[in-house]
């Protein structure tokens, strides 16, 4: 899967319309673009009627091939506003190989001032759009946009969704034949269900025949303007079953839309927000006196993307999660709660320099690029021992501010000093107990308490481990304020938040003591020397008494494969019995439904990447719970699934 982003190459004609150089075609007809969209995509699919018939708390899903300028999305959103119940939701999924850059997108949408209520929210969030799945949330969660950035035959096969309406809007088949292939139409069929409808401009004969072969009943209908005819259709083919029952979707929860989230750190607060935005009443149980008291409580965390040039599952998740987090941060106060000051990873030795060279070749310049030492120093504002890799969209975040912001939704109730010791399943409800005291109950529970989720029997076998880390808080000086970007080597140092820099962080695999130690403060100061002797001097490190330094220690929680553990939980004993045959033949796929623990989910194991992976994982949990399109490629969601460890034990006999 390609990791390089190619933006649309746009020329503008004398009437202000964008013209694609890649496809030598216009994005929409002059003076008729919106009317064409309304006729072909909204009218032929009877979208207004569909929206009006959406029941409260249900979600209509539109799939599109070719996002382009977003016109179809904006028009569909406007129609949804006009006709849908206020508690219904819209999820729009669109594939785009060559996304417009921000400036081109702003110029294109300025042609439709009547759609400003819909175009402006997108422009505000149109940041960090990189290859893979990129999710946007609008209208307090009522509308979700998932852009699949890349080649359609790389992206759509990874989509896990059930589409109600298709907009086929790639450039004309003669200009863009890759968007009109039997392989693509097979993917449309895979993602459709009886009742799925389709609209498209093209009436090309071989396109119609290929769609019919894929399972769509197609017909020509009157067109608009210079387009005499267009096509519409409906899916009448078979519905494929899931291939791997252990990763199949559990039944969508019925009954009251109430959930418990245990833990109010990044994983818990973002999961609660994702559910609340979907109309759930969420109770968050936190054992401390306030949210973000453990690993999510550091004064500054770094938005650092540890990527792979090989497109691994972790790398794909980081790229998608980074974009989602950056869009969430737009709602916080810049400078106090976060700052997009960039992150500079120093090439501190030959091995690191080689790794960075591969990354610079694999990813686009807007995401990361190599800097020589002089260039790096000019950006950082302090002298450095080497150049490195610069991530211009990175920066630092005050994690407690993000947690607090996520928990402010009116559908969330936070209860502190609630230490859940035991879960009990009673009928269709889960009960949270502290000794002989019932704290709360709900049909859905999400365990988001880092490694402490293992105190609950359904998570007891999850291989989570705790790694102690300590940060050091250094008082800023007049000269240390010259630091303008986060700089990383083996450790990291951030520009000041208020009057303090954050320096860290140690790794201790053995200690269970969370009292900050002088030795680790000294270790962090040594890391600072490796980052910048100049900055250490500006901070007066030589005169600092390590015994008087302030800091903070917490446990990171990580898994053996460094991917988080996110998704529905199964009964471990019943799982082992149901799929015991895998121990003899791993190629077997038993026709046995997974023994889910109905309504029970986990979101844990984010390690030092929680700022990037936890918010999108909250969306992943909510998608599992509500039966919505997953916000990550299916293979990535499976790589994060809690069942992966039980499968490995069965197959490897461990």
UniProtKB/Swiss-Prot annotation:
Xref: SUPFAM superfamilies = FAD/NAD(P)-binding domain, S-adenosyl-L-methionine-dependent methyltransferases
Tell me the Gene3D superfamilies matching this sequence.
D-Amino Acid Oxidase, subunit A, domain 2, FAD/NAD(P)-binding domain, Vaccinia Virus protein VP39
Keyword Coiled coil found: no
Q: Which cofactor does it need?
A: FAD
Q: Which reaction does it catalyse?
A: 5-aminomethyl-2-thiouridine(34) in tRNA + S-adenosyl-L-methionine = 5-methylaminomethyl-2-thiouridine(34) in tRNA + S-adenosyl-L-homocysteine + H(+)
Which parts pass through the membrane? none
| Superkingdom to which the source organism belongs | Bacteria
Instruction: Tell me where it mainly resides.
Output: cytoplasm
Q: Where in the cell is it found?
A: Cytoplasm
Q: Name one GO molecular function term.
A: tRNA (5-methylaminomethyl-2-thiouridylate)(34)-methyltransferase activity
> Entry's Pfam families?
DAO, Methyltransf_30
Listed under GO biological process in this entry are: methylation; tRNA wobble uridine modification
HAMAP family listed in its UniProt record: MnmC (MF_01102)
The record's family statement is: In the N-terminal section; belongs to the methyltransferase superfamily. tRNA (mnm(5)s(2)U34)-methyltransferase family.
How is this protein named in the record?
tRNA 5-methylaminomethyl-2-thiouridine biosynthesis bifunctional protein MnmC
């Amino acid at each position: 899967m390609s990791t390089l982003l190619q933006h649309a190459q746009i020329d503008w004609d004398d009437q202000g319309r964008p013209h694609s150089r890649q496809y030598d075609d216009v994005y929409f007809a002059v003076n008729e673009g919106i009317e064409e969209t309304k006729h072909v995509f909204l009218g032929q699919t009877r979208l207004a009627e569909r929206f009006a018939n959406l029941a409260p708390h249900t979600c209509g899903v539109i799939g599109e091939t070719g996002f382009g300028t977003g016109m179809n999305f904006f028009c569909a959103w406007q129609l949804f506003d006009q006709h849908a119940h206020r508690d219904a939701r819209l999820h729009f999924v669109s594939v785009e190989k060559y996304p417009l850059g921000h400036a081109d997108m702003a110029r294109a949408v300025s042609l439709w001032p009547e759609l400003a209520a819909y175009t402006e929210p997108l422009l505000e969030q149109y940041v960090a759009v990189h290859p893979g799945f990129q999710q946007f949330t609008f209208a307090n969660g009522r509308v979700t946009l998932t852009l699949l950035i890349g080649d359609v035959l790389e992206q759509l096969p990874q989509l896990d969704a059930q589409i109600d309406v298709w907009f086929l809007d790639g450039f004309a088949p003669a200009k863009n034949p890759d968007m009109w292939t039997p392989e693509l139409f097979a993917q449309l069929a895979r993602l459709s269900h009886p009742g799925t409808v389709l609209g498209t401009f093209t009436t090309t004969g071989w396109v119609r025949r290929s769609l019919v072969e894929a399972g769509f009943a197609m017909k020509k209908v009157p067109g608009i303007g210079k387009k005499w005819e267009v096509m519409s259709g409906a899916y009448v083919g078979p519905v494929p079953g899931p291939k791997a029952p252990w990763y199949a979707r559990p039944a969508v929860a019925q009954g009251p839309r109430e959930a418990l989230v245990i833990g109010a750190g990044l994983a818990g607060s973002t999961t609660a927000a994702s559910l609340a935005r979907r109309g759930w009443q969420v109770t968050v149980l936190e054992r401390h006196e306030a949210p973000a008291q453990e690993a999510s409580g550091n004064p500054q965390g770094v938005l650092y993307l540890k990527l792979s040039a090989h497109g691994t599952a972790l790398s794909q998740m980081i790229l998608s999660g980074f974009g989602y987090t950056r869009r969430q941060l737009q709602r916080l106060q810049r400078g106090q709660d976060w700052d997009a000051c960039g992150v500079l990873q120093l090439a501190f030795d030959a091995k690191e320099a080689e790794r960075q060279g591969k990354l610079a070749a694999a990813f686009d310049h807007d995401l990361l690029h190599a800097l020589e030492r002089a260039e790096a120093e000019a950006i950082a504002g302090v002298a450095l021992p080497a150049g490195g890799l610069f991530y211009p969209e990175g920066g630092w975040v005050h994690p407690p501010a993000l947690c607090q912001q996520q928990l402010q939704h009116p559908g969330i109730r936070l209860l502190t000093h609630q230490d859940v010791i035991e879960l009990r399943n009673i009928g269709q409800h889960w009960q949270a107990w502290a000794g002989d005291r019932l704290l709360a109950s709900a049909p859905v529970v999400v365990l988001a308490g880092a490694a402490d989720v293992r105190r609950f029997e359904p998570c007891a076998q999850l291989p989570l481990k705790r790694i102690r880390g300590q940060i050091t808080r250094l008082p800023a000086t007049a000269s240390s304020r010259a630091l303008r970007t986060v700089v990383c080597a083996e450790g990291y140092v951030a520009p000041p938040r208020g009057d303090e820099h954050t320096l860290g962080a140690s790794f201790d695999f053995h200690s269970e003591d969370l009292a900050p130690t002088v030795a680790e403060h000294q270790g962090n100061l040594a890391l600072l020397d490796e980052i910048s002797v100049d900055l250490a001097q500006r901070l007066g490190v030589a005169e600092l008494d390590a015994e008087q330094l302030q800091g903070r220690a917490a446990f990171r929680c990580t898994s053996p494969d460094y991917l988080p553990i996110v998704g529905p939980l199964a009964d471990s004993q019943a799982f082992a019995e149901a799929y015991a045959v895998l121990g003899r033949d791993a190629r077997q796929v038993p026709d046995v439904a997974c023994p889910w623990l109905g309504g029970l989910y986990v979101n844990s194991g984010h390690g030092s990447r929680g700022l990037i992976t936890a918010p999108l994982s909250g969306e992943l949990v909510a998608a599992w719970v509500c039966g919505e399109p997953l916000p990550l490629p299916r293979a990535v969601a499976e790589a994060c699934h809690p069942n992966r460890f039980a499968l490995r034990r069965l197959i490897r006999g461990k």
